[in-house]
Swiss-Prot record:
The keyword Transmembrane helix applies. This is UPF0391 membrane protein Nwi_2359. The lineage of its organism: Bacteria, Pseudomonadati, Pseudomonadota, Alphaproteobacteria, Hyphomicrobiales. It is found in: Cell membrane. Its main location: membrane.
Length: 57
């Protein structure tokens, strides 16, 4: 349990340094792009899975 506390403390400290250091603006734009790419891939995967599921029945 203590290992998890130390791990999350380190992650929180790194996130705080990056957030207050000005890197957050650039990271936010990259995160938006990655989010939309993941969303598109999810929709494609769901549609293909739905269509393949229908053919097997």
């Amino acid at each position: 349990m203590l290992n998890w506390v130390v791990t999350f403390l380190v992650i929180a400290l790194i996130a705080g340094v990056l957030g207050f250091g000005g890197i957050a603006g650039a990271s936010f734009e990259i995160a938006k792009i990655i989010f939309f790419i993941a969303l598109i891939l999810f929709v494609i995967s769901a549609v293909v899975g739905f269509l393949r599921g229908r053919n097997r029945v």
